[in-house]
């Protein structure tokens, strides 16, 4: 039986010999992987990718002629608050010399590419610059210290030729530091539109910014409508700002970017962001994920709601916290890691779309002098083989250290390809494209104690099993291990780099073995699928007429049927059909959440649940209600006649709880909502305390939404 299984594996996984450790030359992903779902052209799905987050300024100076001059620049990079010279040409150089390809990286997440302020800012006697990219002034121009538009286009083109996607950081929450009373401070938060001044923070007569002071982060509302530190906070309920950011992101999409990382999503109205995402998906849909900072692995209701309802994924801080606690800080054990995976799978509708990571530019690096290299290598192996889209912070493969800003943003120390961390990444990263169990699979714990975790990823008939022993001094005897691996002998994909061993399976029962101290091993089986099996649908929402990409296995070559709920889509509405990918037009059905299924050769696939169909083009509307007094424990909610307002439900799909502290004060309440454009809405507010509902009286309120821009509708409680 194993000989047959082995033939299937060799015939369906082009990279098998590479994964087993043979010295095949590394080819770009576009050359190795023939499946459509794994191609660099698949901008809607990053499940088969490994992201490499790079601080552009800190990576490599490929063009010294574009470096800043004077006090803003330190070519030695000893002053980490100044520019160090890294640019897009430096990235191009490392793409061309195959550093990223040899590492196994298939997506680069670069610093925000837009023009930042040129002024330096003195904080506590230290000169600060916008090297990080988060002090924008013009979202329609490039940061000249990174390169020109031509340079950026060259970066995208060069990356694509090597099978590498480009993700841009994007920060529509704010412009740059400003002081209300001092127009000479920095650049007064001024916003420009391709060189033309839109407005500054002081004397903001057009209401482009919020002027509510700095946030103390005590509530979600406080963090949204007040300034993030001293950054000039943009008012997304202003039609000019709304249009500006829809136009600005389209400019970068038209340059060919493949993904967007949205900064500070916790600090912008969810309703505006959903309307913005709808405009992106209607233009050129790309994988988008946001930053919602969490300080622990504990569930957060607002974070979960955003991940499930906003139209974008999130950086998975719950995953990050659990991994750091277990592997870096020794403050919890493998049971906590397993619990995190179980809890997040239950909480996040599309858990495989959340972006996993072990460190980034806003926290201490994983590696310190007190953290053994093996713990870093194990954390990398876990992240690369776990659910979600893995992101590796630049320099991790070189064991770069640094606690806090700016030390966690140091200069790339070397480009060695011989470190163990580099080796671990390069061996495991290709699994995401060769074995769909890693890209799309479910997760099941198979063996566990405080220090050892053995888990299985499974998709269809494809399987991967990963064993990690974080105890660096004590081996563990593994008995009674049962998996879905077919009968046969399986070699460690890592080739023993982390002291892993081979195993033998007999009908899924694994012969007893000893997992060495500090060992990590990965065993995998890849099989072809004859049954249609959906792994991913992207984007996660869209309006009728948008094209959606369905990825998976076993769809066959003959065009079948796609179902949105019970609505069948056939014929020309299916724009392409391949064994691993289908592109289909969303049918003209009512807005709401739908299960997507595929029928091929008379066989129905699994259901991919919670795909959101919008009622049409979206606009952001602020709903305000006056004189809504409440008793202790009561909050104000909104519902109405479209799915975006909950279709008259008082349950989880209703809107709220409304806010009443910053833009308006109690007993006036407000909330920003993404609703269909150019449509007459009917709606009502209600009070809710647990299961107790109190509706306002009178007839339904009505409001016709604008066809573009934003609006505010204000009513009195009746």
UniProtKB/Swiss-Prot annotation:
Cystine residue pairs: 77-84
Keywords noted in UniProt: Calcium, Disulfide bond, Glycosyltransferase, Metal-binding, Secreted, Signal, Transferase
Record-annotated CBM20 domain positions: 613-718
E.C. no: 2.4.1.19
Pfam families for the chain: Alpha-amylase (PF00128), Alpha-amylase_C (PF02806), CBM_20 (PF00686), TIG (PF01833)
Catalytic reactions of this protein: Cyclizes part of a (1->4)-alpha-D-glucan chain by formation of a (1->4)-alpha-D-glucosidic bond
Occurrences of domain IPT/TIG (ranges): 532-612
Amino acids binding Ca(2+) 1: 61, 63, 66-67, 85, 87
Region (A2): 237-440
Region called D, residue ranges: 529-614
Cellular component terms per the entry's GO annotation: extracellular region
Cell compartments where the protein resides: Secreted
Residue segments, region B: 173-236
Biological process annotations from GO: carbohydrate metabolic process
Region (C): 441-528
PANTHER family linked: ALPHA-AMYLASE 1, ALPHA-AMYLASE FAMILY MEMBER
Name this protein carries in UniProt: Cyclomaltodextrin glucanotransferase
């Amino acid at each position: 039986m194993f000989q047959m299984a082995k033939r299937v594996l060799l015939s369906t996984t082009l990279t098998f010999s590479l994964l087993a450790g043979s010295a095949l030359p590394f080819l770009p992903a576009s050359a190795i992987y023939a499946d459509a779902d794994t191609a660099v052209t698949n901008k809607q799905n990053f499940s088969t990718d490994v992201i490499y987050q790079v601080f552009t300024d800190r990576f490599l100076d490929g063009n010294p002629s574009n470096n800043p001059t004077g006090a803003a620049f330190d070519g030695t990079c000893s002053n980490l608050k100044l520019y160090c010279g890294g640019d897009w040409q430096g990235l191009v150089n490392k793409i061309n010399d195959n550093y990223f390809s040899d590492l196994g990286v298939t997506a680069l997440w670069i610093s925000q590419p837009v023009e930042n302020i040129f002024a330096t800012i003195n904080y506590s006697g230290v000169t600060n610059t916008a090297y990080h990219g988060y002090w924008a002034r013009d979202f329609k121009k490039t940061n000249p210290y990174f390169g020109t538009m031509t340079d950026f286009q060259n970066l995208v083109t060069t990356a694509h030729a090597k099978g590498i996607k480009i993700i841009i950081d994007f920060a529509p929450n704010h412009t740059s530091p400003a002081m209300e009373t001092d127009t000479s401070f920095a650049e007064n938060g001024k916003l420009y539109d391709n060189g033309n001044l839109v407005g500054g923070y002081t004397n903001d007569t057009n209401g482009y910014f919020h002027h509510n002071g700095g946030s103390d982060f005590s509530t979600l509302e406080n963090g949204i409508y007040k300034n993030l530190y001293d950054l000039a906070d943009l008012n997304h309920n202003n039609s000019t700002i709304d249009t500006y950011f829809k136009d600005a992101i389209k400019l970068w999409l038209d340059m060919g970017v493949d993904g967007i990382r949205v900064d500070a999503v916790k600090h912008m109205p969810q309703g505006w962001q959903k309307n913005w995402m709808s405009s992106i998906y209607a233009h050129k849909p790309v994988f988008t994920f946001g930053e919602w900072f969490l300080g622990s692995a504990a569930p957060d209701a607002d974070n979960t709601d955003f991940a499930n309802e906003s139209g974008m994924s999130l950086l998975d801080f719950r995953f990050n916290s659990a991994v750091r606690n277990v592997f870096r800080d020794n403050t919890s054990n493998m049971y906590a890691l397993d619990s995190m995976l179980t809890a997040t799978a239950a909480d996040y509708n599309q858990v495989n779309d959340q972006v996993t990571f072990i460190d980034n530019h806003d926290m201490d690096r994983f590696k310190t002098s007190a953290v053994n290299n093996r713990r870093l290598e194990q954390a990398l192996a876990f992240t690369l083989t776990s659910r979600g889209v893995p992101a590796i912070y630049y320099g991790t493969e070189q064991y770069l250290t640094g606690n806090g800003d700016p030390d966690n943003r140091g200069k790339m120390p070397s480009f060695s390809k011989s470190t163990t961390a580099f080796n671990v990444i390069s061996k495991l990263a290709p699994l995401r494209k060769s074995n769909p169990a890693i890209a799309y699979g479910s997760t099941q714990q198979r063996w566990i104690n405080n220090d050892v975790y053995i888990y299985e990823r499974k998709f269809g008939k494809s399987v991967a099993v990963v064993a990690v022993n974080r105890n660096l001094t004590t081996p563990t005897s593994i008995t009674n291990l049962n998996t879905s691996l077919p009968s046969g002998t399986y070699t460690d994909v890592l080739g023993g780099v982390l002291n892993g061993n081979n195993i033998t399976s007999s009908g899924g029962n694994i012969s007893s073995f000893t997992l060495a101290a500090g060992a990590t091993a990965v065993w995998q089986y890849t099989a072809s699928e004859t049954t249609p099996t959906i792994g991913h649908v992207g984007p996660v929402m869209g309006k009728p007429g948008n094209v959606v990409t369905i990825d998976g296995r076993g769809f066959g070559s003959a065009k079948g049927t796609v179902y949105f709920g019970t609505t069948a889509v056939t014929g020309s509405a299916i724009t392409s059909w391949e064994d691993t990918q289908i592109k289909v037009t969303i049918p003209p059905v009512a807005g709401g959440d739908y299960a997507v299924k595929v029928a091929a050769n008379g066989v129905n696939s699994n259901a991919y649940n919670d795909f959101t169909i919008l009622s049409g083009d979206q606009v952001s509307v602020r709903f305000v209600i006056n004189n809504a007094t409440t008793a202790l424990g009561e909050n104000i909610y909104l519902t109405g006649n479209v799915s975006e307002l909950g279709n008259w439900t008082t349950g989880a799909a209703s809107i709220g709880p409304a806010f009443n502290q910053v833009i308006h004060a109690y007993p006036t309440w407000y909330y920003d909502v993404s609703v269909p454009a150019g449509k007459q809405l009917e709606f009502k507010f209600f009070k809710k305390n647990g299961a107790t509902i109190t509706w306002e009286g009178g007839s339904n309120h009505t409001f016709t939404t604008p066809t573009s821009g934003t609006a505010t509708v204000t009513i009195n409680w009746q």
